[in-house]
Amino acid sequence: MVLCGMFAALVAIGAFIQIPVPYMDYFTLQFFFVLLAGLILGADKGAISVGCYVLLGLVGVPIFAAGGGIGYIFRPSFGYLVGFIVSAYVTGKVCEKLKASYKNYLLACLAGFVVTYAIGIVYKFIILNFYAHTPATLGVIFLSCFPLDMPGDFVLCLLAAGDRKSVV
């Protein structure tokens, strides 16, 4: 359980490691630590650690990239936080099922990547269309992830798989 707390803290720290990108917002390292939580702690403990991080943010501890509090559930980006929990689980589960190798760690990370974006994009669609009354199609939301988010997170998958391989 100590490791769960440590990874919850690492995900929180990752939210504040913000890399500015010209003409865009910023890029954080949260996803990197979410992947490592699943790869190193396994499915259950990885999901618990990321779930603790999300729970702390929802009760008001300002550990999300843009603060904290229960109102965060109405932000279009909250779906990615939900996706992080499932991603840590899926990444850990795939890692547990496959033989230890960089290729398999990368496969586990990519499974987490797909889960994070699937949940995040659908949640953003629901919040924008039904809560914020800002019409947006799933396609437009998906395409809005390409300039920075998806390529950057793909690189984080490569790095996390390499880091996990070096821990073995």
Task: Label the model's feature ranges.
Residues 167-168:
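Conserved small/polar residues in nucleotide/adenosyl-binding loops
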